[in-house]
Every structure is written in structure tokens, then in C-alpha cells.
Curated annotation (Swiss-Prot):
It catalyses: a quinone + NADH + 5 H(+)(in) = a quinol + NAD(+) + 4 H(+)(out). Pfam families: Proton_antipo_M. It is a multi-pass membrane protein. HAMAP family: NDH1_NuoN_1. The keyword Ribonucleoprotein does not apply. Its EC number is 7.1.1.-. Belongs to the complex I subunit 2 family. NDH-1 is composed of 14 different subunits. Subunits NuoA, H, J, K, L, M, N constitute the membrane sector of the complex. One of its GO terms (biological process) is ATP synthesis coupled electron transport. GO terms for molecular function: NADH dehydrogenase (ubiquinone) activity; NADH:ubiquinone reductase (non-electrogenic) activity; quinone binding. This is NADH-quinone oxidoreductase subunit N. It comes from Anaeromyxobacter dehalogenans (strain 2CP-1 / ATCC BAA-258). InterPro entries: NADH-Q_OxRdtase_suN/2 (IPR010096), ND/Mrp_TM (IPR001750).
Amino acid sequence: MSGFPTQDFVALVPVAILTMGALVLLMTEVFLTSGRRAYQAYLTMVFAAAAAGYAAWMPVPGNVFGRQAVVDSFSAFVTVVLCAGLALSALVGQSWLNARNSERGEFYALALFGTAGMVLLGMATDLLIAFIAVEVMSLSTYCLAAFLRRGKKPAEAAFKYVVLGSISSALLLYGSALLYGASGSTLFSVLPRGQGSALYLAGIALVAGGVAFKIAAVPFHAWTPDVYEGAPTPVTAFMAAGVKTAAFAVLVRLFLATESGSAAMSTSLGTVLSALAVLTMIFGNLLALPQRSVKRMLAYSSIGHAGYLLVGVVSAVVAGARDKALAGLLFYLAAYTATVIGAFAVVGALERRTRGDFEPADAWDLDRFAGLARRRPALAFAMAVFLFSLAGVPPTAGFIGKFYIFKAAMGAGLYGLAVLGVLTSVLGAYYYLRVVLYMYFLPSKDEAGEVVLSAPSLTIALAAAVAVVVLLGVVADPMVRLAQAASAIIL
């Protein structure tokens, strides 16, 4: 402890705030009655805001803990996005869990612990720190996936997530060991020393596979639809936004360091990443097309969005358009966080209640959305905004994000990836706009037993998400400038 200067520990204040918040919630849980547990969601928001505020106005950036982690504009931007996603997820979770009499402090504590791991992952510049952060994030999301112990789906989702996630962790750890053997260090910046050896190639492939699992890139995507569908809907929203943001942050840092070696290695890395992007965009959108479950459709579409983000990574890491591509990627992550959490919030609000309990068997079917504009016009409007953003329809945040990523790809000479991204976006628009068609142009089906959540916390979450999606689409310049500043100072 005495070997590190005080500023190293000061850099971890956002992580400490989130961790302390989790401990506070666990301790206060003992003294709260069921009627007062709603305050825990708002307390979670306070800790998230404190961590985000400190990250945004943090003192002088730099490498900390012997260059094992870094505080820079990139990590600050990622931290703010992650904390904003946590706050929205807490609001959505409060209404969803309260309706099921399942609201408990450990839900918010686990979300805070998970976000602490995500924030640390965004700062990591060392394989061991990255692995620790991944495990903190993963263990929290494993528990959250099984939080609602009713029926087989949550248990099945959590079991699949744990088993496949353990394989992912094994790939990451074994790959780290091989990279250490090849380069003599676990620091990202030192890894290129081992380039050219078989150990290095095997290690970087295994580490990339472990991270690809977290972002749900093809062919590491198989867990996504079952886990997203079986997990509690607020947890699905939290995972879809937070895990993807943190994983892409560490992926960018790792590959920016890795490509600094030989030109041959950079070319090989670009080929592999491009192949992953192509497969992920194509299969993510194709598999989403036939889905009648809106929740499962959103799960498959998240795979497609990982493909678009990979285009940004390829442009930044390999093709030399670093600043523009990173700015587009950061903007996209911010827009996607608000959009996907909002979309899952609407899906959760429509889950059917039968025989006194919520029955998810048909809760997410397209027929549940038929005529929603007449029954719940505000809810239908919010869902339409989120779907337009996911489809990349102007003037929404999703359109601006895709525009900047594909523009960076074109500027870097990656015309094939850019054109494929546009084509798969058009394909994705079909299944997104199909839901809008059901909501606005088809008559309602049997509404017997329907219960639509309308808690104040859900209303706040949806209003905030809609505002972000619309404002980032109409007045994008301030956020674009912030993303450009964050991408320009990545240490």
C-alpha cells in the first residue's frame, strides 16, 4: 500500500463510491420495511451520480498503480455512461420488482458491485486488472440473472450464463498466461514485445475470444438470447447496456496497444476483427428477423449492434482513423445505453399478470403490442422512439451513432464494412418497424388479465431515456464534441 502514491488511490474514487454504495444498501436493508425499499433505488441513483460526477471532474489524469490502470478522458466518458445506465436500470428495476413483491436491497447492491467492476474494466491497462474487473462484473450479473427465483426460465438463464461465462473467463485467463509467457509482462503496452511468437498469437486469440463473449460477437453469441429472455427484464437491460460498454472499452485499449507492433500483426488483427464484425452484423440481424418474442428479438438485435461497434473498433485500431472512429464508438455506446434500457423497460411494463402472478410465456409476444397506441399511447410513443433509434432512423441518437461509425469506416477505406453495415441496418429496420406497425395499425388482441406497470419510477426512467434519445439526435454536437475530446486523450 505504501508503495503507491496517494493519487493512485484517488483515481479509484468512482469505484470506491460504487462499492461503498453497495455496502450501505446491504446494511440498510436490515432496517427497512417493504414499503420503504423504494428509496433504495433512489439511493442507488445518488451513488451513481456521485461516481459519475467525480469521474467527470477528476483531477489530473494519468497512469496509476504502476501503469496497471489509467485515468483519462476515455475512462471518464465510459464511467459516466455506465453510471447513467445504472441509474436508469435502478429506476426500471424498482417498478418491476415492486410489482412482484420482490424488491430487496441486494438487487441494487449487486448492480452497484457490477458497475464498479465495469468502471474498473474501463480503466484497465493490465491483463490481471482486466481479469479481476471482468470477474467482479460477471459474478454480479450471474446473481442478478437468477434474482427472481420463480419458474424455470430465470434459473436456466443463470445456469447457462454461469457455465458459458466460466468458459469465457477461462479463455481470458489462459490467454493472459500465454501473453505473459510471450512478452514477460501483463501490461497492455508491453505485450507487443512478444509479437511473432506462437505463444503471442495463441494468447491474443484466447483473450479476444473471452472479450468477444462479453460483447456477444458471433460465434460467441449463443448465450445471449436465452439469458436475455430468461433473466428479469431490468437485469437484461442492465446487462445489454453496461456489459457491452465496459467490454468494448477494454477491447479498444487492448487492441490500440497491440497494433503498435509490426505491420503484419496489425493487418492480421484487422482481418480477424473485420471477419468478426461481418459475421456479427449478418447473423445478429438475420436471427432477429423471425422472432415473435420482442424480448428475444431485442436480444438478437444486440448482437447486430455489437457488429456495428466492431466496425468502429476496426476503423480505430487498424485503419488509422482512430480519433473519428473512437468518437463515433463512444457516442454510439451512450446512445445505445439509453435506447436499449428504455426498450426493455417498455417490454417489462407489458408483462402479463395471470392467476395473481406474472406469467412470461406470452408476455413478450408481438400480439401483446397490437393496439398499444390506443391502450397506452405514451408507452407506445416511447417504444416507437426507442425502436426508431435502434433502427437508425433520423433524427434519433441511433442514427447519429451509426452515421459517425460508418463515416469513420469510409474515411479509413473500409468501404465493404461500411456498406454492409448500412445494408444490415436496413434489414434490422424491418423487425423494429414491425413492432411499430403492431402498436399503431393493428387492433388489440385479448386484453384479459393485462396489467401495465405505471409506477412513478418507470415514468421517470422512460421520460429520461426518451429525452436522451431525442436530444442526442436533434442536438448531437455537444455530445459529439465530448466524445471527440474523450477519444483524443486516451493514454
